[in-house]
Every structure is written in C-alpha cells, then in structure tokens.
Amino acid sequence: MAEGAASREAPAPLDVAGGEDDPRAGADAASGDAAPEASGGRMRDRRSGVALPGNAGVPADSEAGLLEAARATPRRTSIIKDPSNQKCGGRKKTVSFSSMPSEKKISSAHDCISFMQAGCELKKVRPNSRIYNRFFTLDTDLQALRWEPSKKDLEKAKLDISAIKEIRLGKNTETFRNNGLADQICEDCAFSILHGENYESLDLVANSADVANIWVSGLRYLVSRSKQPLDFMEGNQNTPRFMWLKTVFEAADVDGNGIMLEDTSVELIKQLNPTLKESKIRLKFKEIQKSKEKLTTRVTEEEFCEAFCELCTRPEVYFLLVQISKNKEYLDANDLMLFLEVEQGVTHVTEDMCLDIIRRYELSEDGRQKGFLAIDGFTQYLLSPECDIFDPEQKKVAQDMTQPLSHYYINASHNTYLIEDQFRGPADINGYVRALKMGCRSIELDVSDGPDNEPILCNRNNMAMLLSFRSVLEVINKFAFVASEYPLILCLGNHCSLPQQRVMVQQMKKVFGNKLYTEAPLSSESYLPSPEKLKHMIIVKGKKLPSESDLLEGEVTDEDEEAEMSRRVSGDYNGEQKHIWLCRELSDLVSICKSVQYRDFELSMKTQNYWEICSFSETLASRIANEYPEDFVNYNKKFLSRVYPSAMRIDSSNLNPQDFWNCGCQIVAMNFQTPGPMMDLHTGWFLQNGGCGYVLRPSIMRDEVSYFSANTKGIVPGVSPLLLHIKIISGQNFPKPKGACAKGDVIDPYVCVEIHGIPADCSEQRTKTVQQNSDNPIFDETFEFQVNLPELTMVRFVILDDDYIGDEFIGQYTIPFECLQPGYRHVPLRSFVGDIMEHVTLFVHIAITNRSGGGKAQKRSLSVRMGKKVREYTMLRNIGLKTIDDIFKIAVHPLREAIDMRENMQNAIVSVKELCGLPPIASLKQCLLTLSSRLITSDSTPSVSLVMKDCFPYLEPLGTIPDVQKRMLAAYDLMIQESRVLIEMADTVQEKIVQCQKAGMEFHEELHNLGAKEGLKGRKLNKAIESFAWNITVLKGQGDLLKNAKNEAVENIKQIQLACLSCGLSKGPGSAAEAKGKRSLEAIEEKESSEENGKL
C-alpha cells in the first residue's frame, strides 16, 4: 500500500546560546511533527493529548479522616503561578514500568494558560525564510509573551498581550505564503500573532497540532478578556460544566457527605458517557488518588469532576468550541447559528433551530433553560446523526427516476444463492434475504432439474444442500420490495429440462402474479422504460425464442457461467458454446431483458435492439475497457450490459466494480458473500439515492452526443475539477483487529484515505501512526485531492494497525463523493463484514472547493484559486469539415469570455480571503466577519458604511483609514465588481455558447454522410466524429459551468449583504442601508425569478 504522507524529520534541538542570527534552516526546522519518524514510516514516541505540569495534591492520612477533609478542603483547582519552579522543555527521557497514564488532557482555558506559563519550544519563522528555535512562555502576570534565547534586550524579546490584534491558525500570512519552506511546514502546526497598528505578524510553528491549538486558544482567551477581570484563576470550578457536574454528584450522593463509593462513581460516569470502558474509569481514579498520595475506595466531588473532565473531554472538540464561541466555555444560540452556517454548510438557520438543538443535546438543566451548549452537549451533538458525514438528502430517493433503465447503475448480485465460496459453499436461502435487504436489484437464480419434478437451486460443486425453486421464489416475493420499490431483475440461469421449465413458469406466475413484467417492448421506442414506470415489477432476464416463430420449443445458446468455470478448471473448455432447449412458456416471460451474445460494438450498434442485454465476463469486459473505452461508454448509453466475475475466481473473490462503472456498465455483479475492499466500494456506492439500488449515471455518460473515455488521466471536457480537502482529526474507541494474534488491546492506528474513480482521480494518502492509543488517537493531518469527475468518485477511509500480528484491519467507511457533507463530521466505521461498529468513529473536517470556477452551488459553493500563472483555455478541436468547423469557430470567443469571467471572480474571492488571513476553504461569511472585526473602531462604530449601488453592496470609508484597511476594501470592491460582471453578462455569453451547440447538433445525424462526401473514411472519419463529440461536450459543459458560476455569484452577493447587515457595517451615516440592503436582496431574487420564468 502506497504511503501518501511525506517523511518528516525531528525538530532541531534548542540552542540556548544562539541568537536571532543563528537560524535552523531546512526541512528539519520546518517539520510539523511531534516526534522523529522511525524506519518503515512509523512514528515513535507520539503521544495523544498534551502533557501538563502536575498539580500537587493534598495527602489524606486515612480513609477515616476523609469525610472531615472533604468538608474542610476548599474545592479549587490550583494553578502554577511560578513556572520557574517547573521543569520545562527538553525533559530528560525516562523509562517507566507503571501502568498509570502520565498525561493530562486540555479541558479548559485554565489548562491552556497553565501550559503557556510552563512554556514550550516553538519555531519562529522570519520573512527572510529563516527559522529559529525559541522557548516561548507567558508571563506570570499574564501581560506579555516572552521568548529566549535572543540577542535583543529582555524587554524587547516580548510581545504585550494588549498589542495583539488577531491570532490566526494555519499558514495564513504573507510570511508563510511567500516562504520557500512553506510546503514543508505542517498547516495544522502553524499559527501567527498579528500585533500593532500595522498588523505585523509573529509567525510560529509548534511541534504538534495539539500545541498550536493550545497557544491559539489561550492567546485568544487572553485577548478577548483583556478588558475584563481574568476569572480563570478560579480554575474550572465556576464554569457551567463544573456546576452541572457538582449537581450530578450531589444528586447521587444520597448521604450528603461529599464522597461516594468508587463503584457508584464509575457507574455514574458510564451513565453520562456510555462509550467509556469501566477499566479506564477505574484506572483514572487510581491515577488521581496516587497523585494525591492516598488509596481509598471512595471518591470526593472534586475527584469525580476531575476524572470526568479528563476522561470525557476531547481536546480537539474543546479547541473547536473555544474557536466558535470566541473563547467562552460554551456556545450560545448565536454561536451555534454561526457554526452551522459557516462551518457545516447549513442554510436558512434560525435561532429557534439552534435553541432546539441546545434543548436536545445539552446535558445540564441550567444550560437548556438559559440556551447554551457546553462541551459535553456539543460533543454529543457532533456525534449525533445530524453531524453524520453522509448527506441526509441522499438517504431518500433524490435522483430523477424517469430516465431509461440503461441510464442507471444497478445494484447486482452474483451467485446470490451462495453464502460461501462458489467451489465448496452450500446454497442457502439467506443469501437472497441478505442481498434484497441490502437493496440489490439484480439477483441470480441458477435452476436445475430436481427430484419429484420440482426445479431446484444448488451449488453443483456441493450438493449437500438443495433449495427448492418455489421456496426461493416465495422468499424473493416476500423481500423483493422491502428495501426498494424499484424493479427487480431476475437473472435466470436455466439448466432444466422442458417439463421442469414449464413447472418453473407455473410457479413464477403463481408466486409473483401481476408483479411479473411481460409486456412486449414497443418497436416505436428507442430506450427501455424508466425505473419509475417499472415500480414493483419483477423482470426476467434470460434467453428468448424468435418472436416470428410459432414453435412451442426451440434451441438457444447456453450462457452457463458456472458450467464454463467448471470446464475451464477441468480443462474441457474449447471455446465452443453449448446449446439448450427452451420452451415457449418460459421464453414469453422474458420481455425487456432478452439475453444476447456480444459480437462487437459496430455490429451491436447496428443490429441490437434496445431491449436486449449482453453479459460480459470480467476478462472480456476488462479487455474491451482497455482497448475500446469510448466505444464501451457509447454502447452503454442505450443498452444494458452485465459484467460478472471471472470464472477463475473459485474463492468467490470480487472484481473491482469501479473499473466497469467507469465504462458505464450498469449491472456489475458482486459476490455479496465475500467481504473486502471491493465489496466495500459496491456497498458504499449504492448507499446513495436512498439505497434504492439505482444510481443515475453522470450526464456525460448519458448524453447522446458527448465525449468521455473511461481511461482518461486528465481533466474531463466540460467538467470543472474540484478540490477535496479532508482533515483527519481524531479517532474514537478503535477496537483491536479481529484477527490479531498479539496479546493485549494496545494498537498503533493510522488512517488511509483512498480516492476511487476514473484513473485521473485515483489517489491515496495516509496519516502518521499514533502510538499505543485506541481510545482517542489524535492525527490532525490535512490532505487535498483533485477530483475531475465528482459524480463517479468514491472516498474510502481505512483504519489500520501499524504494529499488527496477523491482522491489521480496524475499520473502514466508503462514501460517494456526492454524498459528503461539508464541515466537522463523524464517520461511523464499519467492520470487515460491513457492520456498523457501535461508538467507533473517525472525526474529520470536509471542505470542497473549486479549482478554477464552477463547482457546487449552495452549501458547497466555496472558491479557491489553484491554477497556473498563465490561464489555460479549453480548446475546441478541428473536425475537418469546413461547414461545421466554421460554426465551432464562432464559439471560441464566448468560451474565452466565460472562462475569464469565472476565473476573475474566483481570483478576486481568493484575494479577499488571503488579506483576511483565511484559508481557501473559508466561506465568504467568515471573510466578512474577519473584515468587520478590523473595520470596527474602539468605540464599537464601523469605520466604513454599507452602500447599495444598483443592488450590489459596496463599502465606503467614513473618513481616513489605515493602509491595511484600504487594501482590504480595494480587494472587496474588486470581488463585488467581478461578481457583478459575471451576474450581468453570464446569460448573454451562455446564450451564444448554446446557439453554437444547437447549430452544431443540426449536423449530428448527417455527420457520416458529410464526412464521406469530403473523402473522410476509416480512422479519419472516426477521428472527425470523436472531435465533434468533444466539441459538443465542451460547449455544453462550459455553458453549464457559466450558469452555475452565475448562481454562485448571486448566492455570494446575498451572503455578503446579509453578513454586512449582521456584522453592523450598515450603522453610521448610512442608517438606511439595512432597509435598502434588504430591498436589494428582494430585487435580486425577483430578477432571478423573472429570468427563469422567461426561459421557461
């Protein structure tokens, strides 16, 4: 398995004697990891959580004196006020044989401040690309940040907290962006402190993402509290969380003594957090008591609260909460609304919706009444189905189901009657139950003569268990439409004599009744009926006697896949097909799925009827896919094709369905009884569209005239590539691999992210390994993938054990790209056999951005510039027919205009994001929030005013403003202007492109004749036809991209206006701006509505 993560080295050691002129340059100084990487790509000494300075406990002499001590001791968490007494940085390594955990998690701002006071090593990045190792600390009076060593005077090697304007997480300053070492610096380990009136930056890199988050959270807390008395000195005891835990403890403490039995405390914590193991809770109590030099079976209120906070606080969730809440210990309704809109991509969020979420997930009664969500409620919300990675819209039928049957991928099973391998496994009726419950819409019935004139199903390599044909039909009838109401295809393998064939017909008619679809196909039609029209119908696929013959029986070729396999294995196969006799009654049950033999595409396109279906062995289909990928795609636009596993797969292993989906093959039959990566892809793919078993293929595979090659390794014509940003944050409750031989439950997990799709999209990346942590391993690694054909892409998360013996597989989850939800999401992991594992999840952040315009609208309409300095234009091809080439030449200028407008808008948006210090995945609302924070003066009035000009929101200064603000306003104005040009010009340009497309399509039917007249034939004619399809595809695709870009621009303007109003930028002399802004929103909506109605 290829490793995607780059190898990283250890950070340079701290040089106490070095000054600012003694840089640590190179990759080792820029490393973003917390530990050196050992051979084989494995990380050693990587710990989860963050080690904090220890707190001295008060010893208890005896259990008898515990009650008195509990009443007398003040319940206050101590804070280290003198870091000079603590060991810091470069601690000597020791070997411990104790089973006690030695680390404490960050669970509050108090913990962040404590860590900062103790200090740690950070890398200081200078604008000249030099990097220095420095030891940073927070003053004991919390007024300044200091670093050493430095040649500067001690009073100069510091930064006053009061001078800090902003703290940015990530590489989001000019120093990082322009730094030659930027690519070697971990995004999640970098942060910047902007200070002074000119927003100068102090750019730093921590040794881990955890440490970076601690500094960012702590500094933001200090800055936000700079004008208020600092209350963190009281520790955690006055937080809403502590008050709630105190209430919980007191309710369980029936004696009111302030202590309870350890067993009771363990049970209470398990009730509050069912995911915790009892052994882990008991170990935590022992650790706390050991630190206080006491050993007892009773737990105080303080110990209970401390244990709960350490066990149940996920640092990554705490840092997220602090970031959202602007450094509070909870979220109010406004914070939650902002989180849902900005991070989660939810639209039309109201305060009532947020209060409802708080009421459902907040654990404390006080929080529910006052409308705030503390860390534990927020964690539960993030773990709830509402924050699942899978788009809820795709959990129901969401696609157009009125297109021809050949336009859909169909969930299909091979050897459905088997539950083990096909060579030795017995037949089992549960195979049908399982497949149908999984939404399978094409199943196999391999029928042979049975005793007593009763047809049977069996594995002819294992006759130990026989299934009566009738019993199988009854099971199918019972479960056929439980998971899906759309048509079920029965692939009939007929090996029966004529008398038993007639018994089969009688039984099918009796069991299925009017569900059997036997209507003769209409010769006036060109395509198969739709799934919508065939609801609750059972379609028989099989051989059929010629309709013009009056014979009651006749001879047909036998497509016996199992017999072919047996003959190949035994060496009896000579390439000749067998023939069988077929009765008229069974032939008449076959209507729109008549099995025919494939010859070649040229003959099929001329002679094959739309109701005829070809079956391809895996070997044949693979050869065709490699040699004739474009022809295979075009063939599948009209006809159904079925691909079944190779005859040599006697172990019932599975083929890779993606290889054949890329060619448009609708029915790719899988061995449902064999779990593994290939079955994971199949199962994940058919989760979409409500799991109904039918998935609409990409439009480029359905359009009559379009160009697409399954083997493409570049950009697809007419489709705008997208960038998928995946941050693997953490894992929860990873189990030990099922087949592991090692003793104990310790694992070293890492995560692989796989992208499956067309060859241009296939990719894989992996995280570093987290040592000996299965409960809450922190990965904090971000990956980026370019996706050229999103509609045909799958994302697979795989968790593996790096220190395995026997079995490395921990869990996986596979999801279609189109079903990904943006934002912070939990991935519910599945076992090797595909079952959801309770409480086992992967915490990730998902963002989808445009590469160069277009992309997804609404919740996924983010923007990013990832192109080359020289703009590339999609080129039209020369066909060699002057009349048609002249038409396409007219489209060249409109195409350039369309690409220019889209990319100009995207580039302007990216410029605003960069000046706001935000990453490309940030939303425009985040930009406006950042922008407004800099444009609000010290007396809380804006330095600019929102002014509406022709329904577009401009910002005008209300006096003299600093140069930094001038640059930001100039970038904002350019963004509005480019959006305006796109909105106002898009329809005109798109119409020109559409007219060229229509004019070109008028020659489609006569293309062969025109080519022949011009002397084109053979390969030249085929090339001309291919170029024509390419041009039509480009024109249609670019027209659609421009339309989508206009919709995105309109949505952006609405977001900007609403954000300006909500951020207070409408205040001041332009007091009527708010009302005017609302009117402009209505004007844009009315304009859009009238344009749409005009087109209709």
From Swiss-Prot:
Function field: Involved in an inositol phospholipid-based intracellular signaling cascade. Shows no PLC activity to phosphatidylinositol 4,5-bisphosphate and phosphatidylinositol. Component in the phospho-dependent endocytosis process of GABA A receptor. Acts as an inhibitor of PPP1C.
SUPFAM superfamilies xref list: C2 domain (Calcium/lipid-binding domain, CaLB) (SSF49562), EF-hand (SSF47473), PH domain-like (SSF50729), PLC-like phosphodiesterases (SSF51695)
Keywords, sorted A to Z: Coiled coil, Cytoplasm, Phosphoprotein, Transducer
Location of the region described as Disordered in the Swiss-Prot/TrEMBL record: 1-101, 1067-1096
Locations listed in the record: Cytoplasm
Domain spans labelled PI-PLC X-box: 399-543
Organism from which the protein derives: Rattus norvegicus
Amino acid composition bias (Low complexity), ranges on this chain: 26-41
Gene Ontology molecular function, alphabetical: GABA receptor binding; phosphatidylinositol-4,5-bisphosphate phospholipase C activity
Subunit structure: Interacts with PPP2CA, GABA receptor beta subunits, GABA receptor gamma-2 subunits. Interacts with Ins(1,4,5)P3, Ins(1,4,5,6)P4, GABARAP, and PPP1C. May form a ternary complex with GABA receptor beta subunit and GABARAP. The formation of a ternary complex with GABA receptor beta subunit and GABARAP could be the key step for facilitating the association of GABARAP with the GABA receptor gamma-2 subunit and to allow it to be transported at the right destination.
Gene3D superfamilies recorded: C2 domain, EF-hand, Phosphatidylinositol (PI) phosphodiesterase, Pleckstrin-homology domain (PH domain)/Phosphotyrosine-binding domain (PTB)
GO CC term (a single one): cytoplasm
Top-level taxonomic group: Eukaryota
In-chain residues carrying the UniProt-annotated modification Phosphoserine: S48, S78, S96, S570, S1080
Domain C2: 702-831
Tissue specificity annotation: Expressed in brain. Found in the granular cell and Purkinje cell layers in the cerebellum; and in the hippocampal pyramidal cells, dentate granule cells and pyramidal granule cells of the cerebral cortex in the cerebrum.
Keyword Isomerase: no
Signal peptide: none
Protein name: Inactive phospholipase C-like protein 1
Family to which this protein belongs: Belongs to the PRIP family.
Sites of Phosphothreonine modification: T94, T557
A GO biological-process term: phosphatidylinositol metabolic process
Post-translational modification (record): Phosphorylation of Thr-94 resulted in dissociation of PPP1C from PRIP1. In vitro, phosphorylated by the catalytic subunit of PKA.
Coiled-coil region list: 1040-1060
